[in-house]
From Swiss-Prot:
GTP binds at N120, M121, L122, D123, V149, S150, T151. This is Fe(2+) transporter FeoB. The chain crosses the membrane at residues 282-302, 309-329, 344-366, 383-403, 427-447, 453-473, 518-538, 664-684, 691-711, 722-742. Induction: Iron uptake is repressed by the global regulator Fur. Residues 3-169 form the FeoB-type G domain. The lineage of its organism: Bacteria, Pseudomonadati, Pseudomonadota, Gammaproteobacteria, Enterobacterales.
Amino acid sequence: MKKLTIGLIGNPNSGKTTLFNQLTGARQRVGNWAGVTVERKEGQFSTTDHQVTLVDLPGTYSLTTISSQTSLDEQIACHYILSGDADLLINVVDASNLERNLYLTLQLLELGIPCIVALNMLDIAEKQNIRIEIDALSARLGCPVIPLVSTRGRGIEALKLAIDRYKANENVELVHYAQPLLNEADSLAKVMPSDIPLKQRRWLGLQMLEGDIYSRAYAGEASQHLDAALARLRNEMDDPALHIADARYQCIAAICDVVSNTLTAEPSRFTTAVDKIVLNRFLGLPIFLFVMYLMFLLAINIGGALQPLFDVGSVALFVHGIQWIGYTLHFPDWLTIFLAQGLGGGINTVLPLVPQIGMMYLFLSFLEDSGYMARAAFVMDRLMQALGLPGKSFVPLIVGFGCNVPSVMGARTLDAPRERLMTIMMAPFMSCGARLAIFAVFAAAFFGQNGALAVFSLYMLGIVMAVLTGLMLKYTIMRGEATPFVMELPVYHVPHVKSLIIQTWQRLKGFVLRAGKVIIIVSIFLSAFNSFSLSGKIVDNINDSALASVSRVITPVFKPIGVHEDNWQATVGLFTGAMAKEVVVGTLNTLYTAENIQDEEFNPAEFNLGEELFSAVDETWQSLKDTFSLSVLMNPIEASKGDGEMGTGAMGVMDQKFGSAAAAYSYLIFVLLYVPCISVMGAIARESSRGWMGFSILWGLNIAYSLATLFYQVASYSQHPTYSLVCILAVILFNIVVIGLLRRARSRVDIELLATRKSVSSCCAASTTGDCH
């Protein structure tokens, strides 16, 4: 079979990602475009004659880049197409918005690259009474047009057949430009490198005349003749760029008049009716908050019901199973304990997180595909404008509920460096999926019937602190106003199940692999560090271990937030959590369990793998039956509680160590707001600079310590009024000084992003890494 590389390009919200998932299924690899952290997705699929590598290009409305501050997505798409890496392009076009989508199509066809138009979302177009003559459109464009409904898989085989039959586009003159424009474009093309095809050289000439700044990188000596060409044109026309765009729009209007009835189309009645409620100035925000509450409620409720299968099952396989193998094969005791408690315990810490994190990713994917996520940005526009940010900056922040890394990377879609940087600084405060796992464990141990409210309040606190951080930056070191907010609101539709599953699987797989590597290594390290004293002797009591000795020295620093000296395990959790927040649960589980080790030894004669696995399935089935009972819906934390008797087990020890719900909640505030994990730090450094990464870390530590201290000292004021008053005044005074210093430093701060100064011409090459972080 012949190998073929195809670029998939289209407008945002045209169904491009759904088509990508339909074609490639699970055969996807996620990496980065070289030199930048914008995600690059590649997939594999086969046709009758070809083995295809499909490259999913960022969504863009055109290939024209007027300003260096424009979204990097447009730059990447343009450079990839001009690089010649793609043998063929598939242009995904939204049939319900044909006129707007055809602008990009015309630019692609003018380049002369073999192109297939995938006319998607025909089901939505039909509901709006839009009729499109496919054959007439194909004849007008001079390339194959394949009707599709990617959410239902309709037209996929026809698209594969068109790929096998692909050839050069027919030589159809699509756009009629004014003769002076063509003359100057041809004069520029003559002095461009001769290895570029003539058609592409003329296209580059028109792009340069339109004001596209990145086409100059390919034009060679022609860029030196540009000013003279523009001067000659201005003697004959007012604005060359306007004439070029107008010629294209006239061509599009002529095509649409012949092939469709878009002028008599009816807007979606369902979308219009729902938007009257969802976008209502009074109801929009409460509905958004309810959707966010519903997201983590279902994640905890259904995910918690599935947890026994992963928890009890992994204990049976990786802890008791390894112990049984060790005793049966007569391993040394130390090796059996090391493998079962270190390796097996680490795996057992990761797997129970899967159901809840997976449900959250599934819910986020549903919101994105259904069209609600764009509405959330619209609803939050007024609030974001108050911060000097456009409403669409809230979209990457919402993505932060799943993981902060793509949230930081998503700031690339914003136009101005100031807006990108402010969004990057706000992103780490959005509560990610890993923090949800921590909140669920603490809620089960400390908050009982108020568990759901406690977790919801932490989510809202993260949003509030992100907003306050934006306000602080706006009035200190990043003054300015937001750019005008224009964003497409796609029609509501039911997401395709296959697409949802693939998106959820890709996110969950990345989480498990990333978390698993770190948690297992940390669990093994902690198990070893717990077994020896500072002098190197083996200890029987964890409180005599080297880890305990070192942690006790540091723990008094956290006394103002409610972490007492004997609760040194909580301090270790904070330090390991800087590597990855999901490690906090594993750390506390390892350390609190070690302190509560029972004298009862494992008996291999009583071990029955089948019975333990059956018990896991049975417990999961019972949990699923109870999931939607009224009591569980009122208190979803109960579904994931996991440890019914709080007097025993790791959760019981944790309950005793913290001593009060106030201390536990204060600890959670600190976990929510303090330093982001290593992968997020790396993303911040790559998207901005190491200096801004350092600022993000220090600012996060400051507000985490300040807010946690204020909460705990107010909650426990009656127990030690003098100490609490001193702590409260110290925190307030310190932050007044910090804000004052930031205001004075405003004139010396460079908000230009490091990433915007990078050469974008290198973005066409694929990153060799498969990790999107």
